[in-house]
């Protein structure tokens, strides 16, 4: 019976775990992004950072920038993994491909389905969404 009570306590704590998620292009990642991620991480037990890519949008961002070389999705994922390597068991980096999804608000339904699929594939369900963009705030109430 003592073991069962212990197991119930562990299960109860697991249910209480705060899981956060942040979406961004991180094109390129900068100190504002890093500070936002650490601020979000300070409020949760586990944080999932979603690096969003869209081939056409990313190309336009590159042409409109002063970057000498276009960062690939792999570059952006590697930057994030490198920056948060000491928190790799608490801050998880994922990739969301947004190719073919119309921009907000027209692609809202397709985008939210892609996000839900990613959550399912990566086996997590966020209890809080952190974002500087208003469009993501409504995702919480619709999901």
Describe these PLM feature segments:
Residues 3-143:
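Nucleotidyltransferase catalytic core that binds NTPs
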């Amino acid at each position: 019976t003592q073991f069962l009570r212990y197991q119930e306590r562990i299960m109860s704590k697991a249910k209480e775990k705060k899981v956060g998620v942040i979406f961004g292009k991180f094109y390129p990642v900068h100190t504002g992004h890093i500070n936002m991620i650490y601020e979000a991480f300070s409020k949760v037990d586990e944080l999932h950072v979603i690096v969003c890519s869209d081939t056409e949008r990313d190309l336009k961002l590159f042409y409109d920038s002063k970057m000498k070389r276009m960062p690939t999705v792999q570059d952006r994922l590697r930057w994030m993994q490198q920056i948060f390597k000491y928190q790799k068991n608490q801050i998880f980096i994922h990739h969301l491909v947004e190719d073919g999804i119309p921009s907000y608000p027209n692609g809202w339904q397709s985008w939210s389905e892609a996000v839900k699929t990613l959550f399912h594939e990566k086996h997590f369900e966020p209890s809080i969404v952190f974002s500087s963009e208003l469009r993501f705030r409504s995702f919480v109430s619709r999901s």
